[in-house]
Swiss-Prot record:
This is NmrA-like family domain-containing protein 1. Disulfide bonds: none annotated. GO terms for molecular function: identical protein binding. NADP(+) binds at residues 7-12, 33-37, 71. Belongs to the NmrA-type oxidoreductase family. It comes from Rattus norvegicus (Rat). Keywords: Cytoplasm, NADP, Nucleus. It is found in: Cytoplasm; Cytoplasm, Perinuclear region; Nucleus. It comes from the Eukaryota.
Length: 150
């Protein structure tokens, strides 16, 4: 019988995998979220690991670090407010400094870090100007004649 053990580098999963292997009547496959653990490497060497399947997908939660999740929640609210009226909506963020942010290494991280520095220096906002801001659709409608020759 073939048995797949998930969480094999944890205490419970590791124990299950070892017990099944020691029994000798089972073929065992193990799955782990962290293939870089020393315990896994030692176990693989000891047992004569035959295959490693590695997923090359990036960990999007690590890359984005949750910085834009709140923006997405707010956007959803504005698109479908009737679904959120009277509901509790949880928004959270971390306290990342501009220096930490620019080290994230994605394209535009330095620009965003500089924007955060600017906002920290000038916390006052011109609310009247903000209220006059247009959506892209409004601006395009107002300026569509400017694009007629293109």
């Amino acid at each position: 019988k073939l048995v797949v053990v998930f969480g094999a580098t944890g205490a419970q999963g590791g124990s299950v995998a070892r017990t099944l292997l020691e029994d000798g009547t089972f073929r065992v496959r193990v799955v782990t979220r962290n293939p870089e653990q020393k315990l896994l490497a030692d176990l693989a060497k000891r047992l004569g690991l035959h295959y490693v399947v590695y997923s090359g997908l990036e960990n999007i939660k690590k890359l984005a670090a949750g910085h834009f999740d709140g923006k997405g929640e707010v956007e959803e609210y504005f698109r479908k407010p009737e679904e959120y009226i009277g509901q509790n909506v949880g928004l959270s963020t971390c306290r990342t400094t501009p220096e930490e942010y620019e080290k994230l290494g994605f394209q535009g991280a330095q620009d965003l870090a500089n924007m955060f520095r600017f906002y920290a220096l000038k916390p006052d906002r011109n609310i009247d100007l903000t209220l006059r801001a247009q959506t892209l659709d409004q601006w395009l409608e107002q300026h569509k004649g400017d694009f007629a020759h293109l």
